[in-house]
Amino acid sequence: MGLHFKWPLGAPMLAAIYAMSVVLKMLPALGMACPPKCRCEKLLFYCDSQGFHSVPNATDKGSLGLSLRHNHITALERDQFASFSQLTWLHLDHNQISTVKEDAFQGLYKLKELILSSNKIFYLPNTTFTQLINLQNLDLSFNQLSSLHPELFYGLRKLQTLHLRSNSLRTIPVRLFWDCRSLEFLDLSTNRLRSLARNGFAGLIKLRELHLEHNQLTKINFAHFLRLSSLHTLFLQWNKISNLTCGMDWTWSTLEKLDLTGNEIKAIDLTVFETMPNLKILLMDNNKLNSLDSKILNSLKSLTTVGLSGNLWECSPRVCALASWLGSFQGRWEHSILCHSPDHTQGEDILDAVHGFQLCWNLSTTVTAMATTYRDPTTEYTKISSSSYHVGDKEIPTTAGIAVTTEEHFPEPDNAIFTQRVITGTMALLFSFFFIIFIVFISRKCCPPTLRRIRQCSMIQNHRQLRSQTRLHMSNMSDQGPYNEYEPTHEGPFIIINGYGQCKCQQLPYKECEV
């Protein structure tokens, strides 16, 4: 029994399907007309630096990317990009945009990246980004924004990076970032922020990096960062911060890097770093610190890198706690930590000053000395004022009114430095000795023919000198009369012994012996 297959579609239906397929193939080609002055690659339009004063009309509603960088666009009107509903990225940086109307980006539901940096935007309506529900990267840096509406970023739940650098922001509205639950990077640097609201960063549960450098902040209470439970890096350099406090007892276990360079910090709360048990990098260069309490230093247990240069370190017994901590610190510091006062220690490394001027009795124990020394010009002696010092948790008072008469104070040479110099010199001599041996060995290996010729010439010269000496000796011996005189008394040969030994001679008529 055979099987018979019958095509269920007739000829008219097949023709209709074929025509539809042809039309579908032609649609992309019909919509791919490139805007004038633009460069198009598939569905990406590049219209950079072409002198546009407004957004060109869409010629392809299916375009995925549009770049209008470095043009002369001054305003973004309402529904300006309604015909670009498929855009995934839009670059409008380096224009002259000053006005952005409400719903200017309406219809861009698929947009993931929006760049508006380097314009003249001074105000943004609260509904500007409402419909950008898939936006991940927003750049508003280098504009003229002085304030932000509290609901400006509402609905941006997929936003991951937000750049607000180099504007004129003075405050951060409460709950401004409440809906930005996916934000990981926030840059608020180079603004005019003077203070931080307590709930200014509420909602940023995934934020890992926060930039607040180059502002006008004067006080920092780390309790304001309580909601930043994932923060890894905090930049606070080049502000006007003079005091660091922490108004709450909590643990900030995620923070690993804190940069406070270039501020005016004079005092630090004793417990401020106890909230950061995993802090690895602490930079406090170029501040106004003159000492650090041992409790602050002992709380930095996970630190691997520290920056403390450019401060007003007072190299007196008050610096002993810092010197002891630096001596046992296993990590590295970025720059040299130098004394600022008193004058005779200015410019000296702290550790060198402590050893050279014997500022601390024992660096193996954490000592915070509160005693101060000063010079009395009338009596010419050094006086130690009554005070106390701390060894561990015990306070030990010093004796008041102790006076030590002296005319001049010269620091004794440091034995450790002397020993180090001796070791260094010995090592240098040993190195020179082995270097010379090495050069000789290389010369013998690399130049044997030359050495052989030198040796042969030396042997020939020695041989010639030996022959000359032998001839001279023979001449001297001949001058002394080597033959003995004799009187012939008989005929025939006889034996005569002279200076050259025994020889047999023949008697001759004259008094000589012929060998």
Swiss-Prot record:
According to its record, how does it sit in the membrane? Single-pass type I membrane protein
Extracellular compartment segments: 34-421
LRR repeat copies, ranges:
63-83, 86-107, 110-131, 134-155, 158-179, 182-203, 206-227, 230-251, 254-275, 278-299
Predominantly, its location class is membrane
Per the UniProt entry, the signal peptide is: 1-33
At which positions is motif Involved in DLG4-binding? 512-515
> Which SUPFAM superfamilies does UniProt cross-reference here?
L domain-like
- Domain named LRRCT is located at 311-362
TM region positions: 422-442
Q: Tell me the GO BP annotations in alphabetical order.
A: long-term synaptic potentiation; negative regulation of receptor internalization; positive regulation of synapse assembly; regulation of postsynaptic density assembly; synapse organization
Q: Its Gene Ontology molecular function terms? A: neurexin family protein binding
Question: Where is it made, tissue-wise?
Answer: Expressed in neuronal tissues.
Q: What superkingdom does the record give?
A: Eukaryota
Family from the record: Belongs to the LRRTM family.
Quaternary structure, from the entry: Interacts with DLG4. Interacts with neurexin NRXN1; interaction is mediated by heparan sulfate glycan modification on neurexin.
| Domain commentary | Synaptogenic effects are mediated by the extracellular LRR region.
**What does the record give as the function of this protein?**
Involved in the development and maintenance of excitatory synapses in the vertebrate nervous system. Regulates surface expression of AMPA receptors and instructs the development of functional glutamate release sites. Acts as a ligand for the presynaptic receptors NRXN1-A and NRXN1-B.
What is the name listed in the Swiss-Prot or TrEMBL entry for this protein? Leucine-rich repeat transmembrane neuronal protein 2
